[in-house]
């Protein structure tokens, strides 16, 4: 729920995983989620919106095909293809703090499901801002 790292717990236990294992009190998290300006409420609404976008895409069905695409160590990329082969989604995340331009020009015409203002035409370069994720779909 968008909680900052629990460094105090890590210092006590020495277990790296404890840094992100905060245990919420039910009343505390309920209060945070009701506050529309809280980090936890914003995080929860944004995750919900992403899941709603994902739910509507045939290429994200559990039985859809997945192909891993190697674009170097700074970009995580894979392609999902719907069972009926009508939809494909290229998911790319820039894992670095610098702009990345993956060598990925021949992908056809796509639009970004996460940002409706981004559209890519055949031959255009994809430019990823630091830590940006795109879900590029062909329909």
Which role fits each region the language model picked out?
Residues 1-103, 107:
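Loop/helix patches that line or flank the sugar-binding groove of alpha-linked glycan CAZymes
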Residues 6, 18, 112, 126-127:
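Intrinsically disordered, low-complexity, compositionally biased regions/tails
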Residues 50, 110, 131:
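A residue-level signal for conserved active-site and pocket-lining positions in enzyme catalytic cores
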Residues 93, 111-112, 126, 134:
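Intrinsic-disorder/low-complexity peptide segments enriched for small residues
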Residues 106-117:
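Solvent-exposed beta-hairpin/edge-strand motifs
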Residues 121-139:
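C-terminal beta-strand-rich structural cap/linker in extracellular carbohydrate-active enzymes
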């Amino acid at each position: 729920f968008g909680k900052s790292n629990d460094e105090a717990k890590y210092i006590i236990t020495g277990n790296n995983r404890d840094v992100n294992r905060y245990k919420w009190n039910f009343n505390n998290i309920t209060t945070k989620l009701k506050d529309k300006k809280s980090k936890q409420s914003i995080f929860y609404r944004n995750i919900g919106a992403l899941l709603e976008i994902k739910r509507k895409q045939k290429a994200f069905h559990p039985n859809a095909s997945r192909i891993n695409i190697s674009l170097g160590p700074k970009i995580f990329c894979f392609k999902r293809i719907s069972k009926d082969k009508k939809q494909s989604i290229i998911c790319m995340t820039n894992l670095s703090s610098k702009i990345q331009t993956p060598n990925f020009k021949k992908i056809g015409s796509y639009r970004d499901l996460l940002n409706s203002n981004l559209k890519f035409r055949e031959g255009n370069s994809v430019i990823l801002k630091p830590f940006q994720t795109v879900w590029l779909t062909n329909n």
